[in-house]
């Protein structure tokens, strides 16, 4: 910034006056007068023009006070002056002569406009002293300056350093040293949106307390105290042009009681930081989210929803439980305990591997009746990939069923013969209707036979049995080339030896019991089998010994009944050692408190080996 220097020469018998008024600069300069010329040829010039050297050349016009005697030309004069801020002229008398003219130092004038360098980033003006009489007030013009290390009094309680401007070339960056203020009322720039006042230090004796006035502002990097227990940084406003964005630094608060919203359904309290001296501990109060739908991943294959009831004006919480997608589970039969082990953790789109260890069979089933097949415990169960879901305790009492079309291409022409008789021996893949090979998106009919329904007897008929919920439609559908899959838990009514009796089989019946009836049931590990005899037209019968069973225990049971051409049907019952027959639907359950069946369709636990 350049200021023109005006020199006024007043001549009194070879004497002239110099008035100097210069801007605020903190150093002493020497100005070399290059030349001085008169405006006329008279003995006393009207004015003298002085050309001086400096960072920037400028012209100063000097007016004599009168046309008294004086010289009109001064060459190579040197003026020494002290540059300082002032608005009031000082007058000095020097002798006018050829050659050099020496001007004495100019003293600063009080009450002038001055400029102070500070470390802030905003320019402002403040009045330090008010005008009094003829003495003007002092005005302080505060301007930001780059490349200077300064100290600013700040209302916070922590001292830190921050660089406002990055160094460029030989110009150093600006470093702001922030120190806490003691005993003063100050204002701190804060990135929040609420204005408030807090006392950081109480008054002591003649020293006043420190009061912190918090004001919101934009475009400043600040620190906010937050009641959570995680530290993070977020940008509230993006930078625009030369205006920087607002960055909010969130820090955990120490020694306060805070509340965190949690998406679960359980409320609890935990202490994160123990109390120490006068500092209270941090207590985290975890509350369930109000009216929030949350999703929990579970390794089963059943999706269900549970509702936490609303209370007063608080809406209920809905928890949606979904099966884990793409989880590969391997079932291994060994040992006597059921355990689950994760072999590989899921990564990105690659599913993890979960290994489910099931106890090996502990009961040897045997029998001497026709068509009964006995398996030794040393038999190795088929290797498979299955998922066993967690059961719910309030399983619906009843028996589940599903009806499919017989669509095994390799045997359909023989089993579903349009002429002649059904080749019952061609149906050797019962597990197909519960395996991943099944080529039907959903069953034709499915439902539950509850305890209020009759025994699921399928009297030999050209149509399917009329089971609920759509008994009319199902009962009017042809039974030709159809397969019905049944699954249920048999609750043992009394402690005794039981058997399963199957009668009126038309055309083929397969049965599985125990854990393999839930998953791992295959084309070769069935426990009982019966079929229609083409030679004499007699329906199939079978009796399978289930061994000694304990009252109120649950036995998993699965049946597959298939009909080729013509009529179809079958009937069954559970019989104790005294010959008492038990209604299957009265003692059948869809699930227990620890087990449940997989849904019908692909992945129903079948192994089409």
Swiss-Prot record:
Residues 1-21 form the signal peptide. Glycans are attached at residues 75, 161. Keywords: Glycoprotein, Repeat, Signal. GO terms for cellular component: external side of cell wall. It is found in: Cell surface. Sequence repeats lie at residues 77-110, 111-146, 147-182, 183-218, 219-254, 255-290, 291-325, 326-361, 362-391. InterPro entries: GLEYA_adhesin_domain, PA14/GLEYA, S_pombe_Mam3/Map4. It holds the Pfam family GLEYA. Residues 427-589 form the PA14 domain. Residues 75-391 are annotated as: 9 X 36 AA approximate tandem repeats. PROSITE patterns: PA14 (PS51820). The keyword Glycoprotein applies. One of its GO terms (biological process) is flocculation. May be involved in agglutination during conjugation or other aspects of colony formation. Induces flocculation when overexpressed. Belongs to the mam3/map4 family. This is Putative cell agglutination protein pfl4.
């Amino acid at each position: 910034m350049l200021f023109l220097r005006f020199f006024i020469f007043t001549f009194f018998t070879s004497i002239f006056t110099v008035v100097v008024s210069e801007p605020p600069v903190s150093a002493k300069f020497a100005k070399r007068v290059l030349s001085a010329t008169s405006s006329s040829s008279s003995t006393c010039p009207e004015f003298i023009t002085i050309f001086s050297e400096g960072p920037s050349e400028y012209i100063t016009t000097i007016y004599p006070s009168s046309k008294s005697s004086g010289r009109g030309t001064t060459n190579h004069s040197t003026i020494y002056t002290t540059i300082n801020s002032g608005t009031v002229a000082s007058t000095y008398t020097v002798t006018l002569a050829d050659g050099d003219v020496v001007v004495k130092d100019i003293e600063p004038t009080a009450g002038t406009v001055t400029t102070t360098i500070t470390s802030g980033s905003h320019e402002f003006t403040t009045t330090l002293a008010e005008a009094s009489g003829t003495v003007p007030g002092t005005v302080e013009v505060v301007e930001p300056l780059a490349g200077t290390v300064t100290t600013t009094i700040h209302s916070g309680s922590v001292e830190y350093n921050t660089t406002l401007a990055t160094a460029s070339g030989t110009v150093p960056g600006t470093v702001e040293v922030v120190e806490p203020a003691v005993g003063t009322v100050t204002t701190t720039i804060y990135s929040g949106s609420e204005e408030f006042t807090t006392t950081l230090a109480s008054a002591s004796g003649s020293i006043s307390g420190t009061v912190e006035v918090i004001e919101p502002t934009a475009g400043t990097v600040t620190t906010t105290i937050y009641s959570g227990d995680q530290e993070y940084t977020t940008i509230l406003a993006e930078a625009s042009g030369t205006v920087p964005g607002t960055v909010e630094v969130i820090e955990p608060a120490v020694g306060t009681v805070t509340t965190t919203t949690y998406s679960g359904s359980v409320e609890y309290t935990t202490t994160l930081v123990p109390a120490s001296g006068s500092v209270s501990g941090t207590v985290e109060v975890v509350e369930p989210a109000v009216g929030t739908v949350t999703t929990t991943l579970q390794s089963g294959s059943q999706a269900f929803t549970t509702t936490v009831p609303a209370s007063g004006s608080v809406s209920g919480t809905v928890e949606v439980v979904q099966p884990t997608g793409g989880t590969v589970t391997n079932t291994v039969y060994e040992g006597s305990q059921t355990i689950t082990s994760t072999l590989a953790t899921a990564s990105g789109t690659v599913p993890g591997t979960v290994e489910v260890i099931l106890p090996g069979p502990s009961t040897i089933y045997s029998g001497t009746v026709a068509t009964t097949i006995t398996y030794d415990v040393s038999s190795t169960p088929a290797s498979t990939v299955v998922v066993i879901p967690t059961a719910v305790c309030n399983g619906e009492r009843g028996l589940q069923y599903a009806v499919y079309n017989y669509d095994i291409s390799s045997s359909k022409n023989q089993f579903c013969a349009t002429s002649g008789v059904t080749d019952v021996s061609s149906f050797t893949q019962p597990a197909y209707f519960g395996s991943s090979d099944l080529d039907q998106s959903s069953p034709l009919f499915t439902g539950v036979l509850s305890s209020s329904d009759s025994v699921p007897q399928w009297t030999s008929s050209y149509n399917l049995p009329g089971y609920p919920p759509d008994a009319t439609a199902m009962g009017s559908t042809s039974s030709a080339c159809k397969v019905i899959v049944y699954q249920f838990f048999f609750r043992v009514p009394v402690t005794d030896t039981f058997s399963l009796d199957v009668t009126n089989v038309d055309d083929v019946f397969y049965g599985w019991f125990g854990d393999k009836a839930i998953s791992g049931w295959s084309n070769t590990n069935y426990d009982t089998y019966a079929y229609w005899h083409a030679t004499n037209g007699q329906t199939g019968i079978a009796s399978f010994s289930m061994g000694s069973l304990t009252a109120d225990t649950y036995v998993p049971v699965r049946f597959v009944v298939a009909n080729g051409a013509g009529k179809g049907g079958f009937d069954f019952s559970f019989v104790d050692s005294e010959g008492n027959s038990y209604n299957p639907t009265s003692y059948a359950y869809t699930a227990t408190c620890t087990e449940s069946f997989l849904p019908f369709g692909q992945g129903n636990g079948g192994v089409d080996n």
